[in-house]
């Protein structure tokens, strides 16, 4: 279609701008959390996160701590957006077609495998710590694109597309990991109800219902029953996203930008990037440094996470991408060099949002969760600083 060449870049540019801006706000939220957690406000901060909110009766109970409302409720909206992005990119975007998906797909696979292996090697003598193997396997797209935005035209657009596609596939892998490895004891009745609601979403899609309201109503019920089932509630957001139609609302208007999926994605981008993810960062990044020494970083769990993010990510992303390009399986992104590709691989070590999220699922005691935060913050910070520094000194894109 004649509109396709202009439509794709505009969608991509809007996405990159939104994610980069969200990355800046997330950075501020994380810094504020660390300041508050190490100030006289710390008791109030942690007490607020532990405050229970909701409703409880014999017939119906929905009462969680503020932290759980953020991690199970608000983050379900984040995962809804992630699911919408994955579906759109695979059906109508940068991940449509085998040739486009090979390089970011291979790099994403390496970028999940190598950090997990590094973590497992460091924690091989600690059976309890092995549960955190997936923590360094994630990449924070908002943080990484925020760093790239600071570099402007010094980084070619092709590498920004590569990083975006890689991070989306990385999110898909993280979703699969959460579903398979971090599911609690199952409530079969709630799971059956969730299955029925999922079937209802499929029926709405097959009947070509293009109004969003029915999907969102069923999706809200789906979230409740998934929460009660023992499967992590955020996966309800992904399931809902896969049911939202990509069909055009008006057949006379070309392009998927007129679809219910795009309308919902557009409506969610700014609230998620500028509110939900920063709130999550503020609630989960706060860790007190009181009494901490060098041993707090060199303990197996934080060391495994930090090395997994910094060392494992660059080895996996760059190593697998280099191998794919050298063997002819994939092509180098346009106007990019191997040095720039390595710089982007360093930025993939910024794990933050998804790493903190998986850390909260992997462990349930406060001391271990604090250890995961130290590892995530250290690995992400070193990756961000060195990745930015390298891309800054390299010659700009052609």
Curated annotation (Swiss-Prot):
Alphabetical keyword list: Antiport, Cell inner membrane, Cell membrane, Ion transport, Membrane, Sodium, Sodium transport, Transmembrane, Transmembrane helix, Transport
TM stretches of this protein: 21-41, 66-86, 101-121, 132-152, 161-181, 184-204, 216-236, 274-294, 305-325, 343-363, 374-394
Metal-binding among keywords: no
Reaction catalysis annotation: Na(+)(in) + 2 H(+)(out) = Na(+)(out) + 2 H(+)(in)
A Pfam family: Na_H_antiport_1
HAMAP family (alphabetical): NhaA
Protein family (similarity comment): Belongs to the NhaA Na(+)/H(+) (TC 2.A.33) antiporter family.
Protein name: Na(+)/H(+) antiporter NhaA
Gene this chain is encoded by: nhaA
């Amino acid at each position: 279609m004649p509109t396709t060449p202009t439509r794709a870049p505009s969608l991509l540019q809007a996405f990159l701008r939104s994610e980069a801006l969200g990355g800046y706000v997330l950075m501020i939220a994380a810094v504020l959390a660390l300041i508050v957690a190490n100030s006289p406000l710390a008791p109030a901060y942690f007490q607020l996160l532990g405050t229970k909110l909701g409703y409880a009766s014999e017939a119906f109970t929905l009462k969680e701590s503020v932290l759980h409302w953020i991690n199970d409720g608000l983050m379900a909206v984040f995962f809804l957006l992630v699911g919408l992005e994955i579906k759109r990119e695979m059906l109508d975007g940068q991940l449509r077609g085998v040739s486009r998906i090979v390089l970011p797909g291979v790099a994403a696979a390496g970028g999940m495998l190598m950090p997990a292996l590094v973590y497992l090697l460091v924690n091989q003598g600690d059976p309890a710590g092995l549960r955190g193997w997936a923590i360094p396997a994630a990449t924070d797209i908002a943080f990484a694109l925020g760093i790239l935005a600071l570099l402007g035209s010094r980084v070619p657009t092709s590498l920004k597309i590569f990083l975006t596609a890689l991070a989306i596939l990385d999110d898909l892998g993280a979703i699969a990991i959460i579903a398979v490895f971090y599911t609690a004891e199952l409530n079969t009745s709630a799971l059956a109800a969730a299955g029925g609601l999922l079937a209802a979403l499929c029926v709405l899609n097959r009947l070509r219902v293009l109004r969003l309201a029915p999907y969102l109503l069923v999706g809200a019920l789906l979230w409740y029953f998934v929460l009660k089932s023992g499967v992590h509630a955020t996966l309800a957001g992904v399931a809902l996203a896969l049911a939202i139609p990509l069909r055009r609302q008006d057949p006379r208007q070309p392009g998927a930008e007129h679809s219910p999926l795009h309308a919902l994605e557009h409506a969610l981008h700014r609230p998620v990037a500028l509110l939900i993810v920063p709130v999550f960062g503020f609630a989960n990044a706060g860790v007190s440094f009181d009494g901490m020494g060098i041993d707090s970083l060199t303990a197996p769990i934080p060391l495994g996470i930090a090395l997994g993010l910094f060392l494992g990510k660059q080895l996996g992303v760059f190593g697998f991408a280099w191998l794919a390009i050298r063997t002819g399986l994939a092509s180098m992104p346009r106007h990019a060099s191997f040095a720039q590709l390595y710089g982007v691989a360093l930025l993939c070590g910024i794990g933050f949002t998804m790493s903190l999220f998986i850390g909260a699922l992997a462990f349930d005691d406060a001391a271990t969760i604090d250890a995961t935060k130290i590892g995530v913050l250290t690995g992400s910070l070193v990756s961000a600083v060195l990745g930015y520094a390298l891309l800054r000194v390299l010659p700009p894109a052609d």
